[in-house]
């Protein structure tokens, strides 16, 4: 554990230091289960789960308990009835990072681990993809080329959804996005019913603004980080691999890429990265990194070897 020479709100860890904070937290995840959680191109193994994610799960578990005590103290001050132990105030976790950095895998692994704690078994995961405007609306607004940028999301709907969950509504509904069809599925909904923990994963979830933003409702937040050059290479590699997986489906919006040669696919992927994903990362996503409670830093081989925890 290292503290910067200048006063800082952060504490930095290497993996050896971080894994010592696991204490006796048990590993309740099998290799078979991990395979189902691992994203395309991700290299996460059970050792990384033990050394990185179990200490993280322990930290969040402690913070969930502390947050509930804080809510109880506020209720006592206001003279309100104590909350029903079967319906605690949901703990909201934000997971942010670039396209292709592995934030979806991080969110899924975290969900699986947190749901195994007796005190918070109901853990829901929602991605902000469902809050993108439908393609027809993006076309009307001339925003198709900005898909994934902050302005391409229905931020009011996202705010209403998270506020509804946080305020203890019986249920809240999130739209569903199809990566196959590259659009919102009309009429489809993901129903969230008073979870103990809600994980919200997306590119721009740590965005701030002059008014109340969804990040203001987070109790804990993660930023999955890596060198921009490494993320670009991961994106290109994933694009190449998808020619024989997602793109191979005739129903896929990107089916035409399935017939591309390696060289054609590399050119196409790098152009998408250069014109869309990199600008969004540099202009909108990366500037939100300082807001994260914990930054997970990946090396070129996808492994997490450095972490930065916000202590203030």
UniProtKB/Swiss-Prot annotation:
InterPro entries: P-loop_NTPase, PanK, PRK/URK. The keyword Cytoplasm applies. Was identified as a high-confidence drug target. The gene is coaA. It catalyses: (R)-pantothenate + ATP = (R)-4'-phosphopantothenate + ADP + H(+). Its main location: cytoplasm. Its EC number is 2.7.1.33. GO terms for cellular component: cytoplasm; plasma membrane. GO terms for molecular function: ATP binding; pantothenate kinase activity. It is found in: Cytoplasm. The lineage of its organism: Bacteria, Bacillati, Actinomycetota, Actinomycetes, Mycobacteriales. This is Pantothenate kinase. It is an enzyme of class 2 (transferase). GO terms for biological process: coenzyme A biosynthetic process.
């Amino acid at each position: 554990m290292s503290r910067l020479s200048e006063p800082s709100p952060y504490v930095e860890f290497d993996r050896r230091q971080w894994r010592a904070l696991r204490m006796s937290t048990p590993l309740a995840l099998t290799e078979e289960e991990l395979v189902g959680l691992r994203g395309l191109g991700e290299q996460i193994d059970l050792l990384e789960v033990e050394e990185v994610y179990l200490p993280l799960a322990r930290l969040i578990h402690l913070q969930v308990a502390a947050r509930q005590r804080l809510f109880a103290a506020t209720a006592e001050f206001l003279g309100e009835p104590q909350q029903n132990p079967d319906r605690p105030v949901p703990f909201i976790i934000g997971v942010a990072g670039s396209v292709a950095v592995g934030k979806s895998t991080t969110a899924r692994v975290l969900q699986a681990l947190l749901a195994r704690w007796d005190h918070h078994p109901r853990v829901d995961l929602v991605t902000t993809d469902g809050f993108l405007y439908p393609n027809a609306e993006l076309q009307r607004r001339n925003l198709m080329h900005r898909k994934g940028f902050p302005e391409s999301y229905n931020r009011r709907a996202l705010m209403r959804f998270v506020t509804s969950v946080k305020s203890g509504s019986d249920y809240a509904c999130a739209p569903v996005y199809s990566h196959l069809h590259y659009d919102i599925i009309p009429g489809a909904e993901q129903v969230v019913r008073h979870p103990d923990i809600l994980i919200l994963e997306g590119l721009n979830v740590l965005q701030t603004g002059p008014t109340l933003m969804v990040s203001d409702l987070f109790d804990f937040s993660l930023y999955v980080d890596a060198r921009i050059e490494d993320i670009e290479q991961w994106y290109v590699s994933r694009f190449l691999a998808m020619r024989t997986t997602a793109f191979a489906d005739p129903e896929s919006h990107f089916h035409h890429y399935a017939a591309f040669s390696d060289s054609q696919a590399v050119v196409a992927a790098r152009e998408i990265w250069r014109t869309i994903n990199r600008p969004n990362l540099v202009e909108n996503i990366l500037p939100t990194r300082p807001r994260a409670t914990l930054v997970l830093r990946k090396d070129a081989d996808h492994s997490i070897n450095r972490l930065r925890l916000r202590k203030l």
